[in-house]
Amino acid sequence: EESMKLALHYEVNSAMVYTIAAYHDLGLCEGREFHHIVSGKILFADETLWQWFTDDQMLQMKEAIEDHRASNKQAPRSIYGKIVAEADRIIDPEITLRRTVQYGLSHYPEMDKEHQYERFRKHLADKYAEGGYLKLWIPQSDNAGRLAELRQLITNEERIRRVFDQLYEEESILPKIRNL
């Protein structure tokens, strides 16, 4: 749905946009790390698609799927890659901050609260701050405004600390409640 909405701003093939959106995460069946590559292979292996799309279109869709990862260092190779990459990320400050705390607690359980906070701040700076590796490709997307809101929050040390403390408390107590 988001890909189709973003595609309205460009002269693109809507069937290609829809197909890319449908296939871009199918590779998650083999894990997250290389899912973008696996998803492209799944698309390319679908014989039915070859009946509806040209060789060039199939290659362009495969590349768009491969390029959609937020952590990619290079820009997507086509507007199709930019559309799916942008549509795939939903920047919501509250969700982003909560997931960052959750990730730290699940992957680094040995860290105390202060080290978790340092990791939290570093991740936010590396990915979301000005100059961070997260890039938005479609200026008309809803993400642009939400990223600006998140960046403003990140620069407010007092406020971000309060948010972290609250999320840390909530996320730390949940496993204890589940074990009752």
Task: Give each language-model segment a name.
Residues 1-16, 38, 43-51:
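Alpha-helical phosphate/pyrophosphate-handling elements in metalloenzyme active cores
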Residues 5, 9, 29-32, 45, ...:
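Amphipathic alpha-helical interaction surfaces
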Residues 13-31, 35-39, 60-70:
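His-Asp-centered metal-binding catalytic motifs of divalent-metal-dependent phosphohydrolases/nucleases
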Residues 4, 16, 58-61, 111:
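Detector for methionine-enriched segments
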